[in-house]
Amino acid sequence: MMLAVLLAVAAVASATPTIPRAAQAMYNPKLFQGDIMGIAGQEPGHERAAILGDDYLWSGGVVPYIFGPSVDSYQKSVILAGMSDFHDRTCIRFVERTTEANYLEIVTNDSGCWSYVGTIGGMQRLSLDTYGCIYKGTAIHELMHAIGFYHEHCRNDRDDYVTIHYENVQEGYAYAFDKDTYWRYVGEDYNYASIMHYGTYAFSVNWGIAETIVPTDPNVILVEAYDKDHMEQSDANQINNLYASECARRK
């Protein structure tokens, strides 16, 4: 009898999908929308999904950065590969900090994958946890937050493209899918493949089974940011549109 009970418990356990470590690191229930530590120009705990003005863009489209002491050579190579995507396709330039007052400190010894949105002034941290965040796609995603971008699936027009199944969302975390009612249009249509789009099971009560984000187009399969290795052209276009004036100042 005892053996039968143990086998039954084991069968249930094996049938329960395991949340990938990369998803656990990205979907932090303690952070705004899972991976946003704060928003430039807004009080902690009172975030709205929008940067309020160009004052919170990086001057000249240049983002100085340093690596924290925890970042090893392999992690640096992954993060630098993510930065190269910006350099190859946008006017944004990540440069090693010298004496700049505003800069990113990129660390791998904090908890989870997260960033502030926009420049908050002074040193601002960007976390790419060793356990779950060392992916090129994740690095690009968090760096896009740092220069001022939000999640694609929270755009104000998202209901034309996806259905949010709130009945499948973990209790208390429906706010992670709040639409950006202050969304700033920067010239591109909704893109399911955006590096800023979450996957099908974001904040799901039952990973791998209970879908939370379902495309209205049945032919679309949502891919997690950490499973992508580049930004979409629409992402690059939005960056160049948002930073057109800032980057022009650099020339």
What are these regions (language model features)?
Residues 4, 11-251:
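Zinc-dependent metalloendopeptidases
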